[in-house]
Curated annotation (Swiss-Prot):
ATP binds at T9, F10, H14, P15, G16, H17, N92, Y119. Its cofactor is a divalent metal cation. This is FAD synthase. Belongs to the archaeal FAD synthase family. PANTHER family: FAD SYNTHASE. It comes from Methanosphaerula palustris (strain ATCC BAA-1556 / DSM 19958 / E1-9c). One of its GO terms (biological process) is FMN metabolic process. Keywords: ATP-binding, FAD, Flavoprotein, FMN, Nucleotide-binding, Nucleotidyltransferase, Transferase. GO terms for molecular function: ATP binding; FMN adenylyltransferase activity. Pathway: Cofactor biosynthesis; FAD biosynthesis; FAD from FMN: step 1/1. Catalyzes the transfer of the AMP portion of ATP to flavin mononucleotide (FMN) to produce flavin adenine dinucleotide (FAD) coenzyme. HAMAP family: FAD_synth_arch.
Length: 153
């Protein structure tokens, strides 16, 4: 059985996330998805959606066989437990595949590292773009204590 690992924050799920996971699943039989812990996300603003809810959403996606939260201190610990054949990277993940491959070898892991291409030029295939769109279209009405009716948002 060929095991694939995909990783990410998966905040504000969008079609780009789904594309990444669908393409990852095509590379093997079993797809494991490691969802970043809230406190480990340092390369961008903290997630909007709490880690347990992001995990629940990712686990519900059709291509995903197993979803788990990442380790809080060692990002390689779940990889060592899963022992995947392939680790996929999203097109915008800041890992250098060659550097990751060397780090895996140092831990006696021989997974192939594959970068998945982008979903294309879609307007809302980025969590950052979704947040920007909400601010642009709803910003003035998003004040605490005002317009709490979901129909107004």
């Amino acid at each position: 059985m060929r095991r694939i690992v995909a990783t990410g924050t998966f905040d504000l799920l969008h079609p780009g996330h789904l594309f990444y996971l669908q393409e990852s699943k095509k590379l093997g039989d079993e797809l494991y998805v490691i969802v970043a812990r809230d406190r480990n996300v340092k390369h961008k603003p903290r997630p909007i959606i709490p880690e347990e809810q992001r995990l629940q959403m990712v686990a519900a996606l059709k291509p995903v066989d197993h979803a788990l939260l990442g380790d809080t201190t060692d990002m390689f610990r779940p990889i060592e437990a899963i022992r995947p054949d392939v680790i996929t990277l999203g097109f915008n993940q800041n890992f250098d595949p060659a550097v990751l491959t060397e780090a895996l070898k140092a831990r006696s892991l021989s997974a192939e590292v594959v970068r998945i291409g982008g979903y294309g030029d879609r307007v809302l295939c980025s969590s950052r773009r979704i947040v920007q769109r909400v601010i642009e279209t709803r910003g003035p009405s998003l004040r605490v204590g005002q317009n709490t009716d979901p129909e107004d948002l």
